From Swiss-Prot:
It comes from Clostridium botulinum (strain Eklund 17B / Type B). This is UPF0735 ACT domain-containing protein CLL_A2896. Pfam families: ACT_4. Belongs to the UPF0735 family. The lineage of its organism: Bacteria, Bacillati, Bacillota, Clostridia, Eubacteriales. Residues 69-144 form the ACT domain. InterPro entries: ACT-like_dom_sf, ACT_dom, UPF0735_ACT_dom-cont.
Amino acid sequence: MKGNYLVIDKRVLPDVYEKVVFAQKLLKDGKVKEITEATKIAGISRSVYYKYKDYIFDFAETSQGKKVTFNLIVKDQTGVLSGIINYISEQGGNILTINQGIPLNGVANISVTIDMSTLIGDIKTLLNGLSDIQYVEKIEFVAME
């Protein structure tokens, strides 16, 4: 794996990093043509943009052709696991491994690893959709490869 990576919630980072991602998005979407214009709109200097542009990416951009592992805490109800599997399949995810622990105190832990290369959307959309499934109590991102 090239480099050393961390997944960090953007709420704990200085605003400058999110502004670099915003400038990248302006350029990628064709809303601006020049870096100078993108950095001005984003509120950062060109030197800041050039310093970080090759090292900061939106989480969704890193999901092509990768594997992701996440844990779900679900209520012990009939059909929850099949609902999760069906949703992942509908979104184009390829399940590589799935493990469910024995339910204790009415809840079970499920660990899922999927290949994201065929996802219809991005990983954020997938995880948000999974959290909307009835009886899914919590989703925790574990790792991305």
